[in-house]
């Protein structure tokens, strides 16, 4: 396994996302890919509801760099395909959604379900299996309440399991509250945040900027290794 990239923490409002975490249900340390708020314009004022951090397994950097290194931050931020590759890539992801305003599980699950189903229908992949997965997703969240500072946690396995858990104090539990075995749901939850119609443009920009920097470093490290093997005259 690749070493975890050295990255900085990100402060979003009063929520600090650390540089790396070990998600519930995982044996891996993941690095902070990016973070940002989710909000809505209400009566001319931008109201912030949640702070969202997206973490990635270290293998994400070399995997994504093959196709995306050399692109500018703006090119990455504007590319639907780039974020689709992040969502569907063969590496683990972890999403931490921390409330800024109070939120009920029902409010959260209704919105996420709506976004997931809309995405599936738009690409023609909504089946009974996805309907059952959404039903379980809603069931896990329906009786939960999230005062400010509480978190909803998603560990996205590349094998297709979505581990759901909750945190009241900022700490991360070792195991999840529920595991839903459905690859499309595992991807769609993250797609709803950073995909084409993702709810956090700020998190998308943060991901693009931080991954672009890591791609540059990856390319630089490859060049240094190549020059060790075959020194290049200056």
From Swiss-Prot:
GO terms for molecular function: chalcone isomerase activity. The record marks 108 as: Important for catalytic activity. InterPro entries: CFI, Chalcone_isomerase, Chalcone_isomerase_3-sand, Chalcone_isomerase_bundle_sf, Chalcone_isomerase_sf. Catalyzes the intramolecular cyclization of bicyclic chalcones into tricyclic (S)-flavanones. Responsible for the isomerization of 4,2',4',6'-tetrahydroxychalcone (also termed chalcone) into naringenin. Part of the biosynthetic pathway for all classes of flavonoids, a large class of secondary plant metabolites, many of which are brightly colored. It is an enzyme of class 5 (isomerase). It comes from the Eukaryota. This is Chalcone--flavanone isomerase 2. Keywords: Flavonoid biosynthesis, Isomerase. It comes from Vitis vinifera. Belongs to the chalcone isomerase family. GO terms for biological process: flavonoid biosynthetic process. It catalyses: a chalcone = a flavanone. Substrate binds at residues 50, 115, 192.
């Amino acid at each position: 396994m690749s070493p975890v990239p050295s990255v900085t923490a990100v402060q979003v409002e009063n929520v600090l996302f650390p540089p790396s975490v070990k998600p519930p249900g995982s044996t891996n340390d993941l690095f902070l890919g990016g973070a940002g708020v989710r909000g809505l314009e209400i009566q001319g004022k931008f109201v912030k509801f949640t702070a969202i951090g997206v973490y990635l397994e270290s293998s994400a950097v070399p995997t994504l760099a093959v196709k995306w290194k050399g692109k500018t931050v703006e090119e990455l931020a504007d590319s639907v395909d780039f974020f689709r590759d992040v969502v569907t890539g063969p590496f683990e992801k972890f999403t931490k959604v921390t409330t800024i305003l109070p939120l009920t599980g029902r409010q959260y699950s209704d919105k996420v379900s709506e976004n997931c189903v809309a995405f599936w229908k738009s690409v023609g992949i909504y089946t009974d299996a996805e309907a059952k997965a959404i039903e379980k997703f809603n069931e896990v969240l329906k009786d939960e309440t999230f005062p400010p500072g509480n978190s909803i946690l998603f560990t996205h396995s590349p094998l297709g399991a979505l581990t759901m858990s909750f945190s009241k104090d900022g700490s991360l539990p070792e195991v999840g509250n529920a595991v839903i075995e459905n690859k499309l749901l595992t991807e769609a939850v993250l797609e709803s945040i950073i995909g084409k119609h993702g709810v956090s443009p700020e998190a998308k920009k943060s991901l693009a900027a931080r991954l672009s920097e890591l791609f540059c470093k990856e390319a630089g490290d490859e060049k240094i290794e190549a020059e060790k093997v075959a020194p290049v005259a200056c």
